[in-house]
Amino acid sequence: MTKKVYFNHDGGVDDLVSLFLLLQMENVQLIGVSTIGADCYLEPSLSASVKIINRFSNEDIQVAPSYERGKNPFPKEWRMHAFFMDALPILNEPVKHVASNVSDKEAFEDIIQTLKRQSEKVTLLFTGPLTDLAKALQKDSSIVQYIEKLVWMGGTFLPKGNVEEPEHDGSAEWNAYWDPEAVKIVFDSDIEIDMVALESTNQVPLTLDVRQRWANERQYTGIDFLGVSYAAVPPLTHFITNSTYFLWDVLTAAYIGNKDLVHSIEKKVDVISYGPSQGKTFECKDGRKINVINHVDNNAFFDYITALAKKVN
């Protein structure tokens, strides 16, 4: 059964690779895409998104920009990856079919209007901060009735998150930390949430073996795109650092296409919006229920995304 998916991302390598993979999923109908300048700069992310849609599909999807700003910016060095992706030769070859372009609507407007046009409920896929969804909810709370569920790459319940910034205690995950107030707004809504947390994404690091696997099969256009894209980021070699790259967003997108890759548990949770722990997601007896993806079959995951990429030859 085909599911309708709206994708909001923040332009990192794994966000843009996720867009590429979603376009190859036969059980997914991608009905909308928007991007926010969180872990990226907005203009190259917009441009790369349009190019990916036109290069790897025939979909008529207008990519909506977000002009929202978070409380805690991502490091500039991480945000530069969108420029690299936008400049890839494979995305700049002339294409015969150009259906996608930049939308004249802002992301929150595009979310509202796209949801309301549908005859069936939509799965929201967010691989960046929840800022645009929070703004959409504030503008029109009735959109909740059009949402099947939210699948979000964000948050963690581990003792240590992946934020290492001044004046923060290190307990948060970056997408939650960028705009913790947005997380609170979404958590306080009635939307069903599947959270792909660090508990599972930490199980899919980019390793030298993964890179070599893709290098060995680069005769496939899609595999070559994967390999070249991830050449921009540091792999896990000897130990995890603040810059070690995991396939955070790709795992989240893969879960949309194949839920059997993961296991989840139900938790009652909330989020801290302010102070040195801002962005920390935590369990509490009076919290809202969410499904936390806490385990992934590493081999099955990499087999799945590699098979999807091989469809483009």
Where are these regions (language model features)?
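Short, surface-exposed, polar/charged, turn-prone segments marking secondary-structure boundaries
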Residues: V33-T35, N58-V63, I90-P94, W152-G154, ...
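Conformational coupling and interaction surfaces
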Residues: T2, F20-L30, W174-Y177, I185-N313
